[in-house]
């Protein structure tokens, strides 16, 4: 099997890919859009992308690409505790530029503002791309925000460790494919993710849509809106549901009721969630 992931090697996504697929072919891509498009074009069997961080929220690029431009299903979810570090070619390195992915920079903004207020923040496609750039440009007064795996891979020094602003920082990753997958990892729960598009002519449409789960005691763990890209004020809603033994019997009836209300329902995935160790 071929698995596409957001690289290069050393990214948090690559850590998840290597933990889940120990003997499969792993292919890194430069951007989230490239990863999902590789799946769309049949270049790989699965695509692995970040979907949400506990500090900074949803990775909009991932969810928008999946909803608007892909028929892929979510076939597994991985939760990875995230530890961010400031890395450079040496501990004596002068730091005038700090490179990393936008999510990593956002997760460490308090530290960076306190200790490097004059440094220019530079955006890269992934944390490992930042580490690779710093390694390949040793004469630049630069550092990267990345994980310890990237530090080892690119032989960088730790300027500071665990610089994330909040404890308990973690990221969810979605594995995209055709059918639900199982792994020899720590499985924590099962979930269903739906994308709902509400009818224009239904007063209280969102309330009525949510109610089909509430009165059945189906636990909804997340709801979030994203633009439909049609006109201003038009949205689709991403909903996560706990899919335990009881809920699995109730959810089909809830979906039938939604259809009766004129709500367009797309099943994004029915999958298991796995917890990984910190990197």
From Swiss-Prot:
One of its GO terms (biological process) is L-phenylalanine biosynthetic process. Residues 194-272 form the ACT domain. PROSITE patterns: ACT, PREPHENATE_DEHYDR_1, PREPHENATE_DEHYDR_2, PREPHENATE_DEHYDR_3. One of its GO terms (cellular component) is cytoplasm. It holds the Pfam family PDT. Pathway: Amino-acid biosynthesis; L-phenylalanine biosynthesis; phenylpyruvate from prephenate: step 1/1. The record marks 171 as: Essential for activity. Signal peptide: none annotated. One of its GO terms (molecular function) is prephenate dehydratase activity. It comes from the Bacteria. Its EC number is 4.2.1.51. Residues 2-178 form the Prephenate dehydratase domain. InterPro entries: ACT-like_dom_sf, ACT_dom, Preph_deHydtase, Preph_deHydtase_CS. Keywords: Amino-acid biosynthesis, Aromatic amino acid biosynthesis, Lyase, Phenylalanine biosynthesis. It catalyses: prephenate + H(+) = 3-phenylpyruvate + CO2 + H2O. This is Prephenate dehydratase. The lineage of its organism: Bacteria, Bacillati, Bacillota, Bacilli, Lactobacillales.
């Amino acid at each position: 099997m071929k698995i596409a992931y957001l690289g290069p090697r050393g990214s948090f996504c690559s850590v998840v890919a290597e933990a889940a697929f120990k003997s499969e072919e792993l292919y890194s891509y430069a951007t989230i859009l490239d990863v999902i498009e590789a799946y769309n074009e049949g270049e790989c069997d699965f695509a692995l992308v970040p979907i949400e961080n506990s500090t900074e929220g949803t990775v909009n690029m991932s969810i928008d690409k999946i909803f608007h431009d892909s028929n892929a299903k979510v076939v597994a979810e991985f939760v990875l505790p995230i530890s961010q570090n400031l890395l450079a070619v040496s501990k004596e390195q002068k730091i005038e530029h700090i490179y990393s992915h936008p999510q990593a920079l956002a997760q460490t903004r308090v530290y960076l503002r306190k200790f490097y207020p004059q440094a220019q923040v530079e955006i890269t496609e992934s944390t490992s791309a930042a580490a690779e750039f710093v390694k390949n440009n040793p004469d630049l007064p630069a550092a990267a925000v990345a994980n310890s795996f990237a530090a080892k891979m690119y032989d960088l020094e730790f300027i500071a460790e665990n610089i994330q602003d909040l404890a308990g920082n973690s990221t969810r990753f979605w594995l995209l494919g055709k059918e639900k997958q199982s792994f020899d990892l720590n499985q924590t729960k099962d979930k269903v993710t739906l994308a709902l598009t509400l009818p224009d002519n239904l007063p209280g449409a969102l309330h009525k849509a949510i109610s089909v789960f509430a009165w059945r005691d189906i636990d909804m763990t997340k709801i979030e809106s994203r633009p439909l890209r049609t006109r201003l004020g038009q949205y689709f809603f991403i909903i996560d549901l706990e899919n335990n033994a009881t809920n699995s019997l109730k959810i089909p009836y809830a979906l039938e009721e939604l259809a009766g209300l004129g709500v367009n329902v797309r099943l994004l995935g029915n999958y298991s969630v796995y917890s990984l160790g910190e990197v």
